[in-house]
Amino acid sequence: MMIGFIAIVVVVVMWYVGTMNKLRAAALKVDEADSGIDVALTKRYDVLTKQLAVVKEYASHESKTLYETIRLRQGMSMKEKSDVAEKMNEVASQLHITMESYPELKASDNFMALQSSITDVEEHLQAARRLYNANVTSYNTKIVMFPASIVANVLGMTKRELFEAEEYKKQDVEMKF
């Protein structure tokens, strides 16, 4: 009887440790994907800043301030990162409108290279968002499914938020000047 009890305890402990390790691995994947979004946003900011410099070289005047400096910091919530991404979308839209006013700018090799870079950066950012959301969904599913939810509760694991656009950001943008 004692051997049976010890065997049950060993099985339960092994299950607990295995489940704990799986949940922690899922949390690490979410953190890694979160870092991927930070990298993509930083790269996007750098490319937009370079494009703005090229536009300013060709423009004889500035009608508006086209961007505000956005500092990406560790520990931003997904909502804050989403807001930063939206501000960068506005900057990109304004840059494209400004570019239309200067046809010679569109022919610039530097500008064309930057346009290509922006496309690459946008694709990378979208991929980072998809990876993050996939990892968050997997993690959130694991921590609420019984019996793993018991271990998740003991470890204090909580649901993570998805990176998603707010309703008004899903609609077409109307530019007014």
Model-derived regions, located:
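A helix-centric hydrophobic-segment signal that preferentially recognizes long
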Residues: 1-177
